[in-house]
A protein has these predicted regions:
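Boundary regions of SH3-family modules and the immediately adjacent low-complexity/disordered segments
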Residues: 1-2, 25, 29-34, 39-40, ...
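Extended, low-hydrophobicity, Ser/Thr/Pro/Gly-biased non-transmembrane segments
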Residues: 5-7, 15-23, 32
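Active-site nucleophilic cysteine motif
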Residues: 136, 150-164
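Second-shell loop/turn segments in exported
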Residues: 143-150
C-alpha cells in the first residue's frame, strides 16, 4: 500500500516488530511511506524518501494527507488554542516534518484539530535553502544517535538528507 503518511511527531523504524528492537532509522510527521507487510500491531514499511525499511506501530499513519508546508526550525513547539489564547504543549514537530495547513491567523498555522505552529517556523513545501552551512549550524552540539533525524539526536546520513 503506497502513499501513507506518518502522523506522530517522530517515530522509530525498528528492525523487528517489537518496541525494544534495534532502530534502523526514524520517521518524521508527514513523511511518506509504503506498507510492505501487516503484522498484528505493526506495519513493515519502506520510506519513500530514503528507502529505509523496518517496523512502525500500526496506528501511526494517515492515508489522505497532502503536505503543503514543512518545518524549517530545529524544533517547532505545538500549541493548543483556548479561546483567544495559544497555550504551549510539551510536544514539538522537527525540522523537515511536512504539514498540511487547515487554518491560519496572523501568527499561527493550524495543522490538526487544535494543534497550531508558529508561522515563522514553517516554509512552503517546495522551499529550498541554498545555504548548506546555515542548515548544518542548526545541529551544532546535537548528540549523535544511530538512525536519528532530529534535535534529540542525529546520524551522519540524516544530517545530509535534511539539506536535500
Amino acid at each position: 500500500m503506497k502513499n501513507n503518511f506518518f502522523n506522530k511527531p517522530i517515530g522509530n523504524i525498528n528492525l523487528k516488530p517489537v518496541s525494544n528492537s534495534e532502530v534502523s532509522s526514524q520517521i518524521l510527521y508527514g513523511e511518506k511511506f509504503t506498507i510492505l507487510l501487516k503484522k498484528k500491531k505493526w506495519f513493515k514499511i519502506k520510506t519513500n524518501y530514503d528507502g529505509y525499511t523496518g517496523y512502525i506501530k500500526r496506528n501511526n499513519y494517515l492515508k489522505k494527507f497532502k503536505p503543503t508546508y514543512k518545518i524549517y526550525k530545529l524544533k517547532s513547539r505545538i500549541f493548543k488554542k483556548k479561546g483567544n489564547k495559544f497555550l504551549q504543549t510539551k510536544n514539538f514537530l522537527y525540522l523537515g516534518s511536512g504539514i498540511s495547513v487547515i487554518d491560519k491567523n496572523k501568527k499561527f498555522f493550524k495543522f490538526e484539530s487544535n494543534k497550531w505552529l508558529k508561522k515563522r517556523d514553517v516554509k512552503q513545501i517546495d522551499h529550498y535553502e541554498k545555504n548548506f552551512i546555515k542548515i548544518l549550524k542548526l545541529f551544532l552540539n546535537i548528540k549523535y544517535l544511530w538512525g536519528g533525524k532530529t534535535s534529540r539526536g542525529i546520524d551522519c546520513s540524516a544530517l545530509i538528507q535534511i539539506y536535500f
